[in-house]
Swiss-Prot record:
It comes from Prochlorococcus marinus (strain MIT 9515). InterPro entries: Asp/Orn_carbamoyltranf_P-bd, Asp/Orn_carbamoylTrfase, Asp/Orn_carbamoylTrfase_sf, Asp_carbamoyltransf, Asp_carbamoyltransf_Asp/Orn-bd. Signal peptide: none annotated. It catalyses: carbamoyl phosphate + L-aspartate = N-carbamoyl-L-aspartate + phosphate + H(+). This is Aspartate carbamoyltransferase catalytic subunit. Disulfide bonds: none annotated. NCBIfam families: asp_carb_tr, PRK00856.1.
Length: 338
């Protein structure tokens, strides 16, 4: 596996193919242990992990904290409502305080983009060894979700061999509110790194044309691997047209809490055009996998019949895969420069 090169995990834009494979190799090991009934391993015994969530979260926070506990780490949680923030303390001071308490890793989620990055810079300037793991920041990035989505797709297409290269030239359809989705941005970095051809499907107000060049400034180390080049990003305005040749579909939540007014004529109109229903899915004859990062707005972006009845709906797989994926990230950060 080699040395892990990142002190912080803030985005997937600087991940090399080898970084992805290191994460997935560990994810496979941890998943096997979990499936064998192992509740805890002592990999991070003596480490202190602090989750600092300035934005509401159930799935991500619980998944990270369970991942840390399965690695035998000590876990503490920060609650903004009962913290010194209400007394005027800054976000940076809060992070520095937890670092001074001996936190080895800060798991940070915030509604504004780049807050984890700014905290990591301040920590580095004070020469602390504390790492930052971005659990979602504004519209910018959600690296752990991007990784677990990629892992889930690879497991579907290559369940025994676990070959990420199997995604090369696959057509992955991402449907919905890309504009407000940090998950979509992380998915774009991850999928195109392995040569997948991504089709973004939605109205112009939620998928501007500039998304076609989202990953054009690829870091050089992305291409030093057996895959010759990145995949592509194209845009479709018709779900019926784009689903016909898709190899997989990732449905995104319509993020009404982040949305400016007047981006959609109506929720009803959006659902008529972009809600994934059995009728629309029947236009594809390949029994393709369906993913959704959750939480789900049933009947708005995806039909209940697909969630509850379609055999290749992998939403629960995503949730269960999140724990070993996040175990892998915590473990790798704990080994940085050690």
């Amino acid at each position: 596996m080699g040395n892990w090169p990142h002190k912080h995990i803030l985005t997937l834009s600087n991940f090399s193919i080898y970084d992805y494979k290191s994460v997935f190799e560990l994810t496979e090991r941890f998943k096997s242990l979990i499936n064998a009934g192992t509740k805890k391993i002592p990999a991070l015994q003596g480490n202190l992990i602090t989750s600092i969530f300035f934005e509401a979260s159930t799935r991500t926070r619980n998944s990270f904290e369970l991942a840390a506990k399965r690695l035998s780490a000590d876990v503490q949680s920060f609650s903004p409502s009962s913290s010194s923030l209400s007394k005027g303390e800054t976000l940076i001071d809060t992070a520095l305080t937890y670092a001074a308490m001996g936190s080895d890793i800060l798991i940070i989620r915030h509604s504004s983009s780049h807050v984890p990055l700014e905290i990591s810079k301040k920590l580095d300037a004070t020469n602390t060894k504390t790492s930052v793991l971005n659990a979602g920041d504004g519209l910018h990035s959600h690296p752990s979700q991007g990784l677990l989505d990629l892992y889930t797709l690879i497991k579907f297409f290559s369940p025994e061999l676990m070959k990420p290269e199997i995604l090369y030239s696959k057509k992955i359809l991402i449907v919905g509110d890309v504009l407000h989705s940090r998950v979509a941005r992380s998915n774009l970095w991850a999928l195109t790194a392995f040569g997948a051809n991504v089709i973004l499907c939605g109205p112009p107000t939620l998928i501007p044309e500039e998304f076609t060049s989202f990953v054009s400034s690829s870091p050089p180390n992305q291409l030093r691997d057996p895959i010759s080049s990145r995949g592509s990003i194209t845009i479709s305005r018709s779900l019926e047209d784009s689903i016909k040749d898709a190899d997989a579909v990732i449905v995104l939540r319509l993020q009404k809490e982040r949305m400016m007014e007047n981006l959609l004529s109506s929720i009803k109109s959006y659902s008529e055009n972009y809600c994934l229903t059995p009728e629309k899915l029947s236009m594809n004859d390949k029994n393709i996998p369906i993913l959704h990062p959750g939480p789900i707005n049933r009947g708005i972006e995806i039909s209940s019949r697909i969630v509850d009845e379609y055999p290749n709906c992998l939403i629960n797989d995503q949730v269960s895969n999140g724990i070993p994926t996040r175990m892998a990230l915590l473990y790798l950060l704990s080994k940085f420069n050690k």
